[in-house]
Amino acid sequence: VEQGMHDRYDERCGCVPQEVIDRINMEYETIIPNRFTDYILMIWDIHNFCRTPQRVFEFCKRKGIQPPPDGIIPLGPGRGSAGGSMVCYCLGITQCDPILFGLFFERFLNSERIAYPDIDFDISQKYRHIGIAYIADTYGEAYVAQIITYNTLSKNTVVHDVLQTANVPN
């Protein structure tokens, strides 16, 4: 977190603002006692794997999987309530500065929360199989699941959306 804090702020601001340090310390007061540290670091590890060509190339070679040409598995910017976490931002899990955009950490985690919070991120469809193989290999197949959502649209909604996309007035 400390390294990420400097990576995010030193170049942009010349130093790490005290507000950022205070925010991270406040988040630690919830994360550590509630034992969410390992969970957040597991998500960081998955992100780190996807964004580190050497790790991707080595894993793919060991598993006999064709790696991406540049060794990077594209990820989304991180979505949902995790965007309110400065810790997640400094770890590179999310790409939106929660202080700059006025996002609340309490939406992500608070002392009353019992269940693990959602940290939504999207792995490129083209290379998702590599990410899933890494997670299963590292954390165990029994702990890996995929969720898919199917949406249906009415005829009227489809026509409306197509016309709107084509800039046809109502």
What are these regions (language model features)?
Residues 1-170:
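Alpha-helical scaffold/interaction cores of sigma-54-like transcription cofactors
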